A protein has these predicted regions:
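Positively charged n-region of N-terminal signal peptides that target proteins for export
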Residues: 1-6
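Bacterial N-terminal signal peptides
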Residues: 9-18
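Intrinsically disordered, low-complexity segments enriched in glycine/proline and serine/threonine
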Residues: 7-8, 25
């Protein structure tokens, strides 16, 4: 069997509000190398998973999200001015600039943004009978936690500015062949796991009396 490498990119709360830093010092810090040649690296305040070949990616990102098999990379970015709000159009423009600055085709990178500095990123692996899952996570839930069912605080149709950052960004990397339906189920499981972790922290929503999800 030809082993494919699958990837899930999950934005589990809000998008960031901020701008791309100008003049990135293009020094890459390799965080993890996979046996197939893919690499996780950090450059300034961005963490990138660079794909050596085609990978099947399922992403909830607004920027090149959905089901893709033509991406060059996926990334998680912490902006230099995280308190400066912007519209979705501004977010897209900033992500386009960032991708090009990093040397990628902006149409072939799926991105996330967060108020969490990339020095705080966590990378963990778990394996079972040859199947390995790598989780690459940033969590800034204390800044702006919400709960499913809370009143929406952002209206894209009205072109409002994005709210204060409050993200839990999860990137999951699988080293095995997975049917599309199972990959979608894995995204649901990741969401449930994130909710369980928040419940263990007894972290309340900023917008209601319930626990954050």
């Amino acid at each position: 069997m030809v082993m494919k490498h699958f990837f899930i990119l999950c934005i589990l709360t809000l998008l960031f509000s901020g701008t791309v830093s100008e003049g990135l010092a293009m020094e890459k810090e390799v965080l993890l190398k996979f046996e197939n040649g893919d690499v996780i690296y950090r450059i300034e305040d961005t963490v990138v998973i660079d794909f050596l070949d085609k990978r099947d990616v399922l992403s909830s990102s607004l920027f090149n999200g959905g089901w893709r098999n033509d991406l060059q990379a996926v990334l998680n970015h912490h902006p230099a001015k995280e308190q400066e709000a912007m519209t979705v159009e501004g977010y897209f423009a900033n992500m386009n600039r960032l991708c090009k600055k990093l040397g990628y085709d902006a149409g072939k990178v799926s991105t996330m943004g967060t108020g969490v500095p990339m020095k705080n990123i966590a990378i963990k692996q778990a394996a079972y009978e040859g199947i390995r899952v790598t989780a690459v996570v940033t969590a800034g839930a204390e800044g702006n936690p919400g709960r499913v069912g809370d009143k929406a605080v952002y209206n894209a149709i009205a072109k409002e500015k994005l709210p204060r950052p409050g993200t839990i960004n999860i990137m999951l990397y699988f080293n095995c062949d997975m049917p599309p339906g199972i990959l979608a189920r894995a995204l649901v499981t990741a969401t449930e796991a994130k909710t369980a972790a928040l419940q263990e922290l007894i972290l309340g929503s900023r917008y209601s009396s319930g626990l954050a999800t």
